[in-house]
Amino acid sequence: MMLVLRFANLYVEPMAIFLIFLNAFIWSSSFALSKSAMDAASPLFVTGSRMVLAGIVLFGLLLFKRESFRLPRQAVMPIVLLSVIGFYLTNVLEFIGLQGLSSSKACFIYGFSPFTAAFCSYVQLREVVTWKKLGGLSLGLVSYLVYLLFGGGEDVSEWGWQLGMPELLLIVATCLSSYGWTLLRKLERQCESLSITAINAYAMVIAGILSLAHSAITEVWNPLPVENPVLFLQSIGALVIFSNLICYNLFAKLLRSFSSTFLSFCNLVMPLFASFFGWLLLGESFPPGLLFAVGFMVLGCRLIYHEEFRQGYVLSSE
């Protein structure tokens, strides 16, 4: 993990772009791991446990590296806000919303995350959204629609297009997630004495405690809401390593050189990677719209990258 994070500090363009998609590639495995963990224990308990465990591990890394994690007074409220909005509420609303939605429809809603990230960056960081950037975002949305219409595993004609509570919850979760990432980027700029690792450690521990408290109120503890301890420990361990420790921290590191809009756009490839895993490992049919969708994604990615480089939001090196 530390080796990957060190590579993130290079920020040479080819390496940085490679790390962005490598991060999405690794993060896409968290869907299967989360499903496995949910089969072994209650969802809120799973979320709280992995957040607290990951936060403790990050604090341990800070102690090992002898880095300061002293919390400046001006950073207290932003970190609490990040913990509640970007970690706790995002995960809780996402879980509740997913219970009433098909995976393809949830995937479609998540496809709007670059637009919400662009809006949050405009409001919080005063980043300008140009027509060229909107064109790149639109190409990404087209690739998403192509993938869902021709490459998804479900018939989208069976979707109900009414806007119900599950849809609203997932839309809110998407917006809160984008807000959380832009808040993290703003916090890292304002509190230079506090590292990304320390910020994530505090946010994960606080969000984990809130999730466990929520679990204690709404889920049955007898003595713990775990049905399969071995599977639970295996799944939680893998989630902590791949999602919380590697992906969260690498994504946060990349925010130093790329906007949350660009990174959110690049993360649209995660469902495409999931389809690749299904074809390679499970023998599922290769989605016919996959290559077409990837082509649009690459074009949109280049448009946004060059526009943000011109605006000064993307840094080639530090």
UniProtKB/Swiss-Prot annotation:
The keyword ATP-binding does not apply. GO terms for cellular component: plasma membrane. The chain crosses the membrane at residues 7-27, 44-64, 76-96, 105-125, 134-154, 163-183, 193-213, 231-251, 262-282, 285-305. It comes from the Bacteria. The keyword Membrane applies. Residues 25-148, 191-304 form the EamA domain. Keywords: Cell membrane, Membrane, Repeat, Transmembrane, Transmembrane helix, Transport. It is found in: Cell membrane. Its main location: membrane. Belongs to the drug/metabolite transporter (DMT) superfamily. 10 TMS drug/metabolite exporter (DME) (TC 2.A.7.3) family. PANTHER family: INNER MEMBRANE TRANSPORTER (PTHR32322), S-ADENOSYLMETHIONINE_S-ADENOSYLHOMOCYSTEINE TRANSPORTER (PTHR32322:SF18). This is S-adenosylmethionine/S-adenosylhomocysteine transporter. The lineage of its organism: Bacteria, Pseudomonadati, Chlamydiota, Chlamydiia, Chlamydiales.
